[in-house]
């Protein structure tokens, strides 16, 4: 599922991949990133996607931004789209990844406002690389 943007131009930022490892950004469908990796390894189509990303990310980077959800009730941040890319980014030691975001449960609209870095904790701004105004 791809959410649409409020004004046609989603806000895009970059986040340090270490935020995934530290549990500040969680996988939506799995309890851990290791669990996501194991699941994808066991399924042929998912395994093929991982293999393609292992080959393409070192030379091309992550071209498609991950879509992060921020739960409005408790500010939990999770990957909604991009689990395969996140798993490989962690595995390859990629320093940062592009992302877009939405307020959960409004998955239909990707935000055009800057990411609410406070959702990552008091030092949330330190997890963001640079913020791109609408791309």
Name each model feature, range by range.
Residues 1-80, 84-103, 107-119, 131-134:
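Short, charged/polar connector segments at secondary-structure boundaries
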């Amino acid at each position: 599922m791809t959410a649409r943007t409020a004004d046609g131009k989603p806000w895009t930022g970059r986040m340090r991949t270490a935020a995934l490892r530290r549990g500040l950004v969680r996988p939506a469908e799995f309890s851990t990133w290791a669990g996501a990796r194991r699941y994808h390894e066991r399924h042929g189509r998912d395994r093929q996607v991982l293999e393609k990303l292992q080959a393409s990310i070192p030379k091309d980077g992550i071209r498609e931004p991950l879509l992060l959800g921020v739960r409005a009730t408790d500010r939990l941040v999770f990957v909604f789209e991009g689990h395969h890319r996140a798993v490989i980014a962690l595995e390859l030691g990629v320093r940062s990844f592009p992302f877009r975001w939405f307020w959960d449960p409004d998955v239909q609209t990707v935000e055009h406002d800057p990411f609410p870095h406070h959702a990552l904790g008091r030092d949330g701004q330190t997890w963001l690389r640079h913020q791109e105004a609408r791309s």
